[in-house]
Amino acid sequence: MLKRILITNDDGFDSPGLLALKEALCDVAHLTVVAPANEKSACGHGLTLTSPLRFIKLDDDVYKLRDGTPTDCIYLALNALYEEHSKPDLIISGINLGSNMGEDITYSGTASGAMEGVIHGIPSVAFSQLLHDKNTFGFDFALAKKVVRELTLKILSGGFPLGDRKFLNVNIPYVGIEEFKGYKVTEMGYRLYGNDAHLHRNPRGEEHYWLGLHPLAWNERNNARESDFKVATEGYVSITPIKLDLTSYEDIKELEAWI
C-alpha cells in the first residue's frame, strides 16, 4: 500500500517549485496537495480566524485554498479532508523559491507548513531552493527534485529521525547536480538584517512603502557546527533540525534570581 504525503507551500498553487515537488514524488506515494490560492511568502505561522476559507478542487486530491495560509492548508486538510484513521504518513512544505535559513525561518510560510504538521503529530519537512532571485524561467529544479526524492524515500523506508514537535528544514544550494557536494547537518546561522523599508510615491504624491528582502548576510554562532547559510552557499544541502520549544533554558536560573 502506498504511503500518503500531504503537500503545501507558501508560493501558491501555481508555483514551479510545487510542480517540481510533485514531479519528484508522483511515483513514490499517494500525494494530496493543498496550497494557498495566492502567494503567502513571509506570512509566518498565521492561522486565519477572521474570514471563511474555501477549498477549490483543481484535480483529484489537488486543492487550492482561497485566502488561506500554509498553516491553514495543513490544519484544514488534516481536519476536513483526511479521516481520523488515515492521516498522511508525511507532510512536505515547498519547494520554496528562495532560502529559508537562520531567523528567516520565523517569517517563513514554508517552514510554518512543516511546523503545523508536527503540531499535529505528523513527521514534516520544509524544502527551500536557494535562488539569485524569484525569476525561475529556465530553472529545472533538477538537484531539488533529486534531494526531495532521496530524503523522502529515506524517511518513508527508515522512519523519521526526529522526535515530537520537531521538523527538518532543508535548504538546497543554487548549483547543478554535477557541482553538488553532498549533505550536511547544520545549525541555524545568525541572520543579519537592515532597513529594507522602501518609500515610494504615487502620481498624486501619496506615500506608500514596499518591504524588500535584505541581501543574504549572516554571522556564524561560534559553535563547532557549521551554519545553514555557510553550508548551502558552499554547494551542500543543509539539513537543520528545528524544534518548536523556544524556551531559553540556559537563562531560567538567572531569570529566577532576577525576579
Swiss-Prot record:
Record EC number: 3.1.3.5
A GO cellular-component term linked to this record: cytoplasm
Cofactor: how and how many bound: Binds 1 divalent metal cation per subunit.
Catalysis performed (reactions): a ribonucleoside 5'-phosphate + H2O = a ribonucleoside + phosphate
Cell compartments where the protein resides: Cytoplasm
Annotated positions binding a divalent metal cation: 10-11, 41, 96
An example molecular function term from Gene Ontology annotations: 3'-nucleotidase activity
Function: Nucleotidase that shows phosphatase activity on nucleoside 5'-monophosphates.
PANTHER family: 5'-NUCLEOTIDASE SURE (PTHR30457), 5'_3'-NUCLEOTIDASE SURE (PTHR30457:SF12)
Protein name: 5'-nucleotidase SurE
Classification of source organism: Bacteria, Pseudomonadati, Campylobacterota, Epsilonproteobacteria, Campylobacterales
